């Protein structure tokens, strides 16, 4: 609980109160057990793929190094989805001999989701979902994984680029403190993986 609160407080600038409760018995199993297969996933690496320049460079660096990454994408609106699709298609065309692929999930929350509570009009907390999706994909590999979150070091440090981009108006998605809390969280819940920004010093 405290680790999760620290991560979300820092990411969003809000102050979170988090509680846990037992899952009802009828939801004891929330996912079907995967059938056995003789074909193991071909992926040897895992990287978030937002459709931005840094995530594209991250994918290219892996592919140029001979890796077979699983790229993980999340989108909430059409423009982002289009950019991701075009870039992924370009990568597939250029690296046609590679078996790399993409896990892509779209998710938005409509108005009135919680009665009497206004909808969130920012995307400050969006990266928590993005990281969680990447970690979910990593656990499916059945071994220790490193989720790469490519972002240039200056942006990761949350330096205000103009007078308006201060505090909660600017992203903390890849700030070293936030990513360290994610690694604390993974250790606390027993997930054999880590998140890492390969360009933290670039």
PLM features: what roles do these ranges have?
Residues 1-2:
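N-terminal accessory alpha/beta regions
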Residues 7, 11-45, 55-202:
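Nucleotide-activated chemistry modules centered on ATP-dependent adenylation/adenylyltransferase
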Residues 49:
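Phosphate-binding P-loop/Walker A region and its immediate neighborhood
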């Amino acid at each position: 609980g405290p680790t999760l609160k620290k991560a979300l407080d820092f990411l969003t600038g809000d102050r979170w109160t988090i509680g846990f409760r037992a899952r009802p018995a009828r939801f004891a199993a929330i996912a079907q057990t995967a059938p056995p297969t003789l074909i193991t996933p071909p992926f040897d690496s895992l990287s978030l793929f937002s459709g931005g320049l840094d995530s594209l460079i991250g994918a290219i660096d892996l592919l140029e190094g001979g890796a077979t990454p699983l790229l993980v994408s999340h989108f909430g609106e059409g423009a982002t989805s289009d950019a991701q699709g075009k870039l992924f298609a370009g990568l597939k065309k250029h690296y046609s001999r590679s078996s790399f692929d993409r896990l892509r999930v779209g998710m938005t929350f409509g108005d009135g989701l919680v009665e009497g509570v206004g909808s969130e009009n920012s995307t400050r907390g969006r990266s928590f979902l993005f990281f969680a999706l990447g970690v979910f994909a990593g656990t499916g590999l059945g071994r220790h994984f490193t989720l790469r979150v490519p972002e240039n070091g200056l942006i990761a440090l949350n330096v205000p680029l103009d007078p308006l981009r201060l505090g909660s108006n600017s992203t903390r998605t890849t700030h070293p403190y936030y990513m360290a809390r994610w690694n604390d969280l993974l250790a606390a819940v027993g997930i054999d993986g880590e998140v890492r920004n390969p360009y933290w010093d670039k």
